[in-house]
Amino acid sequence: MCSLSFFSLFFMSTLIFILGIYYLMIDYSVFIEWELFNLNGSMVVMTLILDWMSLIFLSFVMYISSLVIYYSEDYMSNEKNINRFIMIVLMFILSMGFLIISPNLISILLGWDGLGLVSYCLVIYYQNVKSYSAGMLTALSNRIGDVAILISIAWMLNFGSWNYIYYYDFIVNSFEMKIITMLIVLAAMTKSAQIPFSSWLPAAMAAPTPVSALVHSSTLVTAGVYLLIRFSPMLNTYNCSWFLLFIGCLTMFMAGLGANLEFDLKKIIALSTLSQLGLMMSILAMGYPKLAFFHLLAHALFKALLFMCAGSMIHNLKDSQDIRFMGSIVNFMPLTSVCFNVSSLSLCGMPFLAGFYSKDLILEMVCLSWINCLIFFLYFFSTGLTASYSFRLFYYSMSGDNSFYSSFSFDDKGFYISFGMIALLFISVFSGSLLSWLVFPIPYMIVLPFYLKFLTITVVILGSYFGYLISNSSFSYNLFSFDMLSSFSFLGSMWFMPFLSTNFISYLPLKFGYYSSKSFDYSWGEMLGGQGLYSLFIYMINYIQSWYDSNFKIYLLTFIFWMFILIVLFSL
């Protein structure tokens, strides 16, 4: 089934890509309305939009999906239910296709909800408690976005249609469209894991690595960015762009810091994805949707390759994901090492690789734009952090001595794994130049002073040196480094966002319940209630009983006392 799915998706991807380039060349779009049924004059219509943007993105999704499924033939070879896994992945691709080619909010919701539901099934695919917790966090975080789209559908009820593409200029200044745009921004922030919804993205690493290569490169996490690219005319109209710009830059900065202090290989790559999503969101908020789309396509290719290389390493190292156990992998797995380093350099923006054409253009547009010093600093500092964690990954995994078992041997075994990586390697190298001439037939005219032109390469070199320094650093009992432990804990745990999204929600009510039961149920309530009355009665009974256990004087005194009372009563 893997081979059949691979050839089908690869063939469809090629056809759709050629069609997308043709539509781009002649500036052509197709708007299809398929009437499902007509009831008393009310039509139920399925609407599709086929323009160059949707077709090229769909072809990239199918191309990466085909290679991921082919890669799974080796990676999931010991899986008993491999066909079930492939079916779930195909449902995932179908949901993404619905989202891409729909200009209608209701059909977008079908794809959006489908992505959330199927991603939950994939995250909990390995059935253990950690996977269940990660799946629940993923599903509940994405539910917020689903609810936002549902509310926006309700707000659009008065417009006569849910095809948002009609309303860019028609009711651009209406109050309803302002609310809808804010809800769409909220939905995109949840799906693309922006602050404060970032915690589900590293948690979703509990899924199999082929799923990570698909989900965190071209599908689930980019759905929010793609939706905002479609809604980009509304962002600047309703002043949502400054908020989105700040959140995107903050997410990029937070993810870069977290990746430099993480030791789990898949989580480092997930945090790098989060950093690039923040970059896409922020450049989109600055008013460059084409540039955000260009980086989305380039990032999808080299990030899928990076995940495939990480999966090959994990597969050969008996499912060990800690980079401290790696080292000298370049001697054992040369093909994986070449692919891994090419994708890492592309992520950093190495000249003439795929990431360079989009990332360098983004940073030059940042220098050219009217933004304040804080945003400018966050952009370039985050770029340095990207180079830092990329060099740190190289340092731990490729250089030095092998830190795994001394009697252990591994190599680039597996034809399907190698084929998937090689197919993505070549397109990761050449796609940047190809896409730059396709998406921008007329290049941007950027005039910058010499020091701003060389600022990007300077920041990358300094970031790589910083990555080397933190790779060689360690805690010392004689220095003040342990005084900084709480700061490192804050920065390395995504600013405590996983805690705020999970334990914090239940922590305070449970703590309040514990202290309430301890203060009331186990103390005051118990002493004033059943246990208190029981103790009082026992005390009184023992006290009265002690009288009868005494000598004859007590009986005589009691007799005289009662006789006195009777005399007083009868005398009255």
Across the structure, where does each feature detected by a protein language model lie?
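Core, highly hydrophobic multi-pass alpha-helical transmembrane subunits of bioenergetic inner membranes
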Residues: M1-L572
